[in-house]
UniProtKB/Swiss-Prot annotation:
This is ATP-dependent DNA helicase Q1. GO terms for biological process: DNA recombination; replication fork processing. Residues 606-617 have a biased composition (Basic and acidic residues). Signal peptide: none annotated. It comes from Mus musculus. The modification N6-acetyllysine is found at K514, K522. The modification Phosphoserine is found at S597, S633. Its main location: nucleus.
Length: 648
């Protein structure tokens, strides 16, 4: 009869195998769920495309851009005359003529066009070719000021109404709205004016009845949708325009809306049949680059000053910052070093914002250091650089902000400084937003990627297929003349989980910085875990691993709300249980270390091949010393050369 100890040993073996099977089942279940979700998305898209195709086939409304790219419409002569003699342009950009023709035909349209593609002309030119005026809804005062400044230079009669408009000005605009002899062609308002001013709506009704309101243009139309990156509640009230003024054409414009957002916007604006024209997201003249953010403020400022005084000497640019405080401090630092810089943020007085905007537009200031308030609609053509002092809170925001560079179609640079701490600063700010954290993590994933073409990453986000070869080496990743490999970081992730579990047992919460300190053997001794050896890697590499573990859900954020701040802590994530399975692997793609010679590189390649084929450790004098280094994925070689996990 078997001894109790033997039975116990077998029982433990069975229990261990069952546990491994449970983990595999969980992994398969998670994968199944991912595939089901993807299946649902694809099925929905196919259904939507079929419905759209059916609707197009049964409708007399020709929805293809090619059908509107014609010069035989009765209004074309006037359109061409205004283009050349008023706007001083000789030809249209892609989709401009098509959109203008649709608007002149009094059809509703949504236009998705990249920043700098010339969206404004699509409603400004038809306004000049029509009787009456066009109402333009914009989310920001700076946007309206910029548009009006350009229109004034062109001799076009346009104005705006906002909270700071004088009574005399409001009275004059209201009178012009119903005056049949008025030359006023464009009236800019914020969405709040539509949502909250009964007097203005009353005047709009009278203008519509008199045949004076010919159309409305909703700029940054993605703001209508709570699924958009910049949702604004007052935009939801804009559905009143189509209900009250059904015969006035409506145009929605955006640079960043996905198909899902556009469908939502269409419902919110009460638009039935409409055309949707989408231009390619690609701006071929923009160079995209992600840089590691220097750890000290002094080094960071010095890095930016070298760029401005070197590569961008005498050239115009924008620096985007996370907070108003950052923008003010950086402006002061730049000014002390002789850079002509000005601050721009939402809490400045209107006249101060206008002054900075005007000085920058006239090249009296070289750089505007701004928050997102210096945003939508900024239309200076010769911006040669846009630097992000911190990453944006979403890919949509980044695409729009970086797109303010190079609107003259000459080369311009979009440089983003990526810092680990910024993830959690921004996360604490967007935690209350509907999909704020999800969108932030998409941005972090973009920054973490060291190998894939930046344009491919942007295209994937906006539901567009892009061939990396067409980038023409206009991004940092496509310019790299290096090879990449997958590094196994599974043990590092296991160590992080051990540290977090011990802290939880001690009723301690760990911020991301405290977690890394504990991992490196620094900070409070009680937070260190026996058996967890401090990795022999630079701190920025450890930060990348933590960020990767967060994106892959081995870690998760937890928030604590105080009277003065929202604090982000890290906890064990939903996928951490998978790490207890020895077969489970977590990998990161990193740049291969430079080899001293081709011979050395070939030798190392042969070593890796031997490890992969034999599946056993190779002898090495450095075996013990390099255990904490990242190993190539799938390799058990503990004696591989020490390598630094390289960022771009």
């Amino acid at each position: 009869m078997a001894s109790v100890s033997a039975l116990t040993e077998e029982l433990e073996s069975v229990a261990s195998e069952l546990h491994a099977i449970d983990i595999q089942i969980q992994e398969l279940t998670e994968r199944r769920q991912e595939l089901l979700q993807r299946k649902s998305v694809l099925t929905g898209k196919i259904k939507q495309y079929l419905e759209d195709s059916s609707a197009e086939a049964s409708s007399d409304l020709d929805t293809s851009p090619a059908a509107w790219n014609k010069e035989d419409f009765p209004w074309f002569g006037k359109v061409k005359d205004v283009l050349q003699n008023v706007f001083k342009l000789q030809k249209f950009r892609p989709l401009q003529l098509e959109t203008i023709n649709v608007t002149m035909a009094r059809k509703d349209i949504f236009l998705v066009m990249p920043t700098g593609g010339g969206k404004s002309l699509c409603y400004q030119l038809p306004a000049l070719c029509s009787d009456g005026f066009t109402l333009v809804i914009c989310p920001l005062i700076s946007l309206m000021e910029d548009q009006l400044m350009v229109l004034k230079q062109l001799g076009i009669s346009a104005t705006m109404l906002n909270a700071s408009s004088s009574k005399e000005h409001v009275k004059w605009v209201h009178a012009e709205m119903v005056n049949k002899n008025s030359q006023l062609k464009l009236i800019y308002v914020t969405p709040e004016k539509i949502a909250k001013s009964k007097m203005f709506m009353s005047r709009l009704e009278k203008a519509y009845e008199a045949g004076r309101l010919t159309g409305a243009a909703v700029d940054e139309v993605h703001c209508c949708s709570q699924w958009g990156h910049d949702f604004r509640p007052d935009y939801k009230a804009l559905g009143i325009l189509k209900r009250q003024f059904p015969n006035a054409s409506l145009m929605g414009l955006t640079a960043t809306a996905t198909n899902h957002v556009l469908k939502d916007v269409q419902k919110i604006l009460c638009v039935g049949k409409c055309l949707t024209f989408t231009a390619s997201f690609n701006r071929p003249n923009l160079f995209y680059e992600v840089r590691q953010k220097p750890s000290s403020a002094e080094d960071f400022t010095e890095d930016i000053v070298k760029l401005i005084n070197g590569r961008y000497k005498g050239q115009s640019g924008i620096i985007y910052c996370f907070s108003q405080k950052d923008s003010e401090q950086i402006t002061i630092s730049l000014q002390k070093l002789g850079i002509h810089a000005g601050t721009y943020h939402a809490n400045m007085e209107p006249e101060d914002k206008t002054k900075v905007h005007t000085q920058w537009s006239a090249n009296e200031l070289q750089v505007v250091v701004a928050t997102v308030a210096f945003g939508m609609g900024i239309d200076k053509p010769d911006v040669r650089f846009v630097i992000h002092h911190s990453m944006s809170k979403s890919m949509e925001n980044y695409y729009q902000e970086s797109g303010r560079a190079g609107r003259d179609d000459s080369r311009a640079d979009c440089i983003l400084y990526y810092g680990f701490g910024d993830i959690f600063r921004i996360s604490s700010m967007v935690v209350m937003e509907n999909v704020g954290q999800q969108k932030l993590y998409e941005m972090v994933s973009y920054c973490q990627n060291v190998s894939k073409c930046r344009r491919v990453l942007i295209a994937q986000h906006f539901d567009e297929v892009w061939n990396a070869d067409a980038c023409n080496k206009m991004c940092d990743n496509c310019c790299k003349d290096v090879s990449f490999e997958k590094k196994n970081v599974t043990q590092h992730c296991r160590d992080l989980i051990k540290i977090l579990k011990q802290a939880e047992g001690l009723n301690e919460k760990l911020t991301p910085l405290k977690l890394i300190d504990a991992w490196m053997g620094k900070g409070a001794a009680k937070l260190r875990v026996a058996g967890v050896v401090a990795p022999a890697l630079p701190r920025e590499d450890l930060e990348r691993i933590v960020a990767h573990a967060l994106l892959q859900q081995y870690l998760k954020e937890d928030y604590s709300f105080t009277a003065y701040a929202t604090i982000s802590y890290l906890k064990v994530g939903p996928r951490a249980c998978l790490l207890s399975n020895e077969a489970h692997a977590v990998t990161m793609q990193v740049k291969k270390s430079a080899q001293s010679s081709v011979r050395g590189a070939l030798s190392e390649a042969r070593q890796v091949e031997q490890v992969d084929s034999k599946g056993e450790e190779q002898s090495s004098g450095n075996s013990q010393k390099s255990k904490s280094r990242l190993q190539p994925s799938g390799s058990k070689n503990a004696g591989a050369k020490k390598r630094k996990l390289d960022d771009a």
